[in-house]
């Protein structure tokens, strides 16, 4: 894949996600069709399916798992597993290009309001947990400790993200996520 086609792919995915979120917020998730999303983005419905396998995926896919796993892998191996995961997640939050706060807020609100999307969110979180755990296990951490550390960190981030999205406060998303990791770091040091 060339740089041009990679850029075009990313641009098309972003157009589809923006169009979907706009339509979901205007007319509701259930009332919005893939055809409407594609038309709003200026592409065919087949192009939609080249980028997202389902309507759910346009909300749930974020592509951060590889970046998160790489950030945890880059964290110092001498740390306790939970601390290492927190260090890696902090690095990922700093270095990964996150979508705008309002886009994240809208995506999470839409996902929280629909049982199918909530289930998909849990499945995506499990995939992220597994990616983090695999990194830790590869460096000699027991599978049990690796799964507990990754699950604890992602549970903290999930709580922080949901509370941030559902609040009326204008604090930055990154501050809320960092505060959740602070709780875990303090717990790990005790």
Where are these predicted regions, by residue range?
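Hydrophobic alpha-helical connector segments
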Residues: 69-107
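Basic, helix-initiating cap at the start of DNA-binding domains
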Residues: 1-27, 31-43, 60, 71
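Short hydrophobic/aromatic patch on the recognition helix
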Residues: 43-52
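Amphipathic alpha-helical packing segments from all-alpha helical-bundle domains
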Residues: 114-139, 147-151
């Amino acid at each position: 894949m060339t740089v041009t086609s990679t850029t075009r792919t990313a641009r098309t995915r972003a157009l589809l996600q923006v169009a979907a979120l706009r339509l979901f917020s205007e007319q509701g998730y259930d009332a919005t069709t893939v055809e409407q999303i594609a038309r709003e983005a200026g592409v065919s419905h087949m192009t939609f399916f080249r980028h997202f396998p389902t309507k759910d995926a346009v909300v749930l896919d974020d592509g951060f798992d590889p970046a998160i796993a790489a950030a945890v892998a880059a964290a110092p191996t001498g740390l306790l597993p939970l601390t290492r995961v927190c260090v890696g997640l902090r690095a990922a939050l700093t270095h990964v290009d996150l979508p705008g706060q309002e886009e994240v807020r809208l995506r999470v609100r839409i996902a929280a309001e629909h049982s199918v999307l909530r289930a998909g969110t849990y499945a995506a979180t499990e995939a992220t947990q597994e990616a983090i755990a695999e990194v830790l296990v590869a460096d000699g951490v027991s599978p049990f400790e690796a799964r507990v550390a990754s699950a604890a960190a992602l549970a903290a981030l999930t709580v922080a993200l949901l509370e941030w999205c559902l609040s009326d406060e204008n604090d930055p998303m990154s501050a809320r996520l960092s505060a959740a990791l602070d709780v875990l770091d303090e717990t790990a040091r005790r």
